């Protein structure tokens, strides 16, 4: 059972870890600033720490009672930080080592979901250019090519021809991790947040881009977010149950966000799970929480409570 904390002093000294050295560093800094301001507004003794490649040194220099982690991507969302904090016996928000590591790796997440009978688009790992023809035969076109361990759609490309597939593989292979192609799903994109085991309202995403890429997420002013999502109550509840099951299968706890697509026939497809979603006041989890009647300050309080789990 999740613990409820009524007094700010019970949290003790809180380190808000942000930044990191991954490609999502700037987004993490924005998330960290928003979280820090909200925690302090709630009377919590919190200190922001801009972490570089050395995640541990700042925590050894000063004593903290717990960590609010908003480092996105590698180093902060992949189990590395979670393992280090476990060794230091410093409680942290969100998922533990195993769930963080699994969720950061999109390929292994898909393997877990497939093994549990959950729907995720067919895919093929691309280890070299020699796999591209096999990809064409197995998946057809179009496909979306992804680095397995990057967030915010970094390194992703849609490919509708053999030439585009080769270019997409070249781009994705530059991120130092496995690369895979996934069958393109023509449909509507949703994202579903989870807070302490309870689903948040779904958000429907609408963008003129080919897909919800980095520009659509952080730069474009043409992206539209619909919450309520427009589905009837029963259908939304079905997708929310799928979101919770997707989290459960990979062990995500505390809070997180699952991205999914619903094709033209109504079939849902799980895409990925985020264990440290964006936390600016314009990010998706805060947006969904607001629709559920939870303001930003209350949201960060609830997330910090997950460090007691």
From Swiss-Prot:
Protein's UniProt keywords contain Metal-binding: yes
Alphabetical UniProt keywords: ATP-binding, Cell shape, Cell wall biogenesis/degradation, Cytoplasm, Ligase, Magnesium, Manganese, Metal-binding, Nucleotide-binding, Peptidoglycan synthesis
Record's keyword annotation contains Ribonucleoprotein: no
Any one of the GO BP annotations: cell wall organization
A GO CC term attached to the entry: cytosol
PROSITE patterns: ATP_GRASP, DALA_DALA_LIGASE_1, DALA_DALA_LIGASE_2
Metabolic or biological pathway: Cell wall biogenesis; peptidoglycan biosynthesis
Subcellular location: Cytoplasm
Enzyme class, broadest EC rank: ligase
UniProt cofactor(s): Mg(2+); Mn(2+)
Enzyme Commission numbers on file: 6.3.2.4
NCBIfam families, alphabetized: D_ala_D_alaTIGR, PRK01372.1
Function: Cell wall formation.
Family stated for the protein in its record: Belongs to the D-alanine--D-alanine ligase family.
Protein name per UniProt: D-alanine--D-alanine ligase
Organism: Methylococcus capsulatus (strain ATCC 33009 / NCIMB 11132 / Bath)
């Amino acid at each position: 059972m999740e613990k409820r904390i009524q007094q700010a002093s019970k949290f003790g000294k809180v380190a808000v870890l942000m930044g990191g050295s991954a490609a999502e560093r700037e987004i993490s800094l924005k998330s960290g600033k928003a979280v820090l301001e909200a925690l302090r507004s709630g009377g919590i003794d919190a200190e922001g720490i801009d972490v570089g490649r050395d995640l541990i040194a700042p925590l050894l220099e000063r004593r903290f009672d717990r960590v609010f982690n908003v480092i996105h991507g590698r180093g902060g969302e992949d189990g590395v930080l979670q393992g280090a904090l476990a060794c230091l016996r410093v409680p942290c928000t969100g998922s533990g080592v195993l769930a963080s590591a699994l969720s950061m790796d999109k390929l292994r997440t898909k393997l877990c979901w497939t093994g549990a009978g959950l729907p995720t688009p067919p895919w093929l790992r691309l280890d070299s250019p020699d796999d591209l023809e096999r990809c064409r035969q197995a998946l057809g076109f179009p496909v979306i090519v992804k680095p397995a361990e990057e967030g915010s759609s970094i390194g992703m490309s849609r490919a509708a021809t053999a030439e585009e597939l080769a270019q997409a593989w070249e781009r994705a292979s530059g991120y130092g991790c496995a690369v895979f192609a996934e069958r393109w799903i023509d449909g509507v994109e949703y994202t579903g947040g989870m807070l302490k085991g309870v689903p948040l309202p779904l958000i429907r995403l609408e963008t003129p881009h080919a897909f919800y890429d980095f520009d659509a997420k952080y730069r474009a002013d043409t992206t539209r977010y619909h919450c309520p999502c427009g589905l009837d109550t029963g259908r939304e509840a079905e997708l929310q149950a799928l979101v919770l099951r997707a989290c459960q299968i990979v062990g995500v706890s505390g809070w997180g966000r699952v991205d999914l697509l619903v094709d033209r026939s109504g079939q849902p497809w799980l895409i990925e799970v985020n264990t440290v979603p964006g936390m600016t006041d314009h990010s998706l989890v805060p947006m969904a929480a607001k629709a559920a009647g939870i303001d930003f300050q209350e949201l960060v309080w609830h997330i910090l409570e997950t460090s007691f789990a």
